[in-house]
Amino acid sequence: LRDGQACFNINSLVLGQGEDLIAQPTGVAQFIALGAALGLPRQRMSSVADAAVDWMDADGEVRAGGAEDARYAGRAEGYRNAGVMMAEVSELRAVQGVDSALYARLRPWLCALPTTRLSPLNPNTLTVDQAPLLVAVSHGRLGLAAAKAVIAARPAGGWSTLDAFWAQ
């Protein structure tokens, strides 16, 4: 049995609904922290986050490390960015800066929930192997070793509240 919400919701990089989406700083910070926990360079993760936000927003303005329609249209097999939330994590593969190696590294940790809400991780269902997700929700303030230790030290009955968990 696996908690289906033990993942980073790629759509939490943005806020809003439909085609009215803007960057969600908390989601961007969590995405960068997840990548760092996986050993990926922060600068690269920041650029991919910017490009993914540009992929989903409809404003046509290029973020610092992002890419809008002109970048994609100029490719050998031109296409346009979506301008809406991602329906499948595999859409990330079309985003500027995401090659097959990066996608393969990130894919096990990602999901595309039909909402822009941040992933509601349940610390009582996380396994030690899922510690990078805990690093992400802490914005990197909790290191990978510390996240693993906290999960390994979970009380037999779990934590009664999120406050009790974060008090660790």
Question: What is the predicted role of each segment?
Answer:
Residues 1-168:
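Compositionally biased linear targeting/interaction segments
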